[in-house]
Amino acid sequence: MHYIRYLLCTVGSVYIKSKEALAKDILKDLVEMCRSVQHPIRGLFLRSYLAQISRDKLPDIGSEYEGEADTVMDAVDFVLQNFTEMNKLWVRMQHQGPARIEEKLEKERSELRDLVGKNLHVLSQIEGVDLEIYKETVLPRVLEQVNCKDELAQYYLMDCIIQVFPDEYHLQTLEILLGACPQLQPTVDIKTVLSRLMDRLSNYAASSPEILPDFLQVEAFAKLSSAISKVIEAQVDMPIVGAVSLYVSLLTFTLRVHPDRLDYVDQVLGACVKKLSGNPKLEDSKATKQIVALLSAPLEKYSDIVTALTLSNYPRVMDHLDAGTNKIMAKIIIENIMKRDTCVSTADKLRFCFELIKGLIKDLDESTTDELDEEDFKEEQNSVARLIHMLYNDDSEEKAKIIYTVRKHILAGGPMRLPFTVPPLVFSALKLIRRLQGQDGDVAGEKVPATPKNIFQLLSQTIEVLSAVPSPEMALRLYLQCAEAANDCDLEPVSYDFFTQAFVLYEEEVADSKAQVTAIHLIIGTLQRMNVFGVENRDTLTHKATGYSAKLLKKPDQCRAVYACSHLFWVDDQDGIKDGERVLLCLKRSLRIANAAQQMANVTRGSSGPVTLFVEILNKYLYFF
């Protein structure tokens, strides 16, 4: 008996083709005939067969079966009726067996879902289904079936609607479609449904700029935002990760469709803050990843990242991240600034930027030093150092404000960070000083005086903090850099003061013998390039340099440092010092030290040792004489 119905469907198909009767009448009879099969699986396959053999015989526009009596509405009505009955059979399948095989039945239902979905595909292919028919007839009747309270059916049908019908129809019927979302069962994966809808709409908007006014006309953003809020309110048990995923999709839609509307972007972030307000710090790793995706989206979209970062709700979202994730997000922000070669050009922008990366420039929790991974910490601080190098403004006064702002923040970061963050600050300030050469006095009406003397004073105080960390070798190098910059600015007292501080640091803090050798050669090399000092100051400094050279731990080191001091008394510049007598004294002194070193080697090793030092001294004699 069951096979006869398949035969009747085939006969009906041939009868329509013969055109001896109206197509709508035959289709109506076939649909009614299928009602006699109420077994869910048998009924589904029978109606699926009916849909398959009749799809090319529908009275569509341009079809050979269209006529005065056969219209597009007849075709639509037939497909919708068949779809409705198939969906009812499909939903009923879940009640066809005992509870113990419920899982098996759900699996079977999932495998048979495409039989139902084919009807919607057929509807989307009917040429005569324009926007009006879709809005007034098709969508309401399909949504009636979505309201069946069955989780699997609701998810699948909503997904089918979004996938098979044109983007233009979705845009123009957005309010109707979104109105069904809060009515879905709490277990329905609504975030995936809405995400796919927003993806389709954003791709549609990207396909042609001419379409964008339509999005504004239908207020797509407002409707999507409202729908998401209603869904989150209706599904009180929705996990945080689900809610945040919805906001990520909405933000992606906003950035693609309304990239110029920063207020929309901030509104999405604000809605996310509201949802997170009951969770001071996120502990769900999946939710945390979604938050990172949410915060990363504006960075990827806008070329002027600093402007994007001024969104008022951006830092409020970051406040809900744990310390580890906050650092990850801070690194992403810095990496984007580096990648886009963005210049942070004002102190106000810098303050906002530092507020966002505060996880890298200070401790956010009570984590002990022992818990920090040394390599990770170095990488983080190097990121901050690179950011400091990106701070620039052509206006000297504004650049000075930037430097003062940087100093304030990095000094609050604790001693461990200073060796990484102070050097870029110093070099950035020295660039400004070279730009300000020749200026003196305060800038009228400014809280931040942009003059070389004042900035040198600031650097002296900053390096002093670094030397107390302790990081004496780094501090000494920076003192010498500042001394050289003061020399270029013709500021003798300032340069002398930096050298004095370098010598004090060398004597009191540099204890390692290898570090002492490196330090004294740096001092000698820097002092040799100085041309700002008068006779008295230069004599004082050169005397200290030669004295410390002769006091190094190892004789070979003493010898090399002393003959290096000879360059302090003979400078090849036109106006440079040329004191041959003192050059000779240095070389003779180094020769005595070399002799002592060889005698010591003879005593300890029983041999005179290599003559390397004598060859090096000979080279110096040849150079000078």
Model-predicted regions and their roles:
Residues 1-334, 502, 512-545, 549, ...:
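Long amphipathic alpha-helical scaffold regions
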Residues 338-624:
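Extended, charge-rich low-complexity regions and/or helical-solenoid scaffolds
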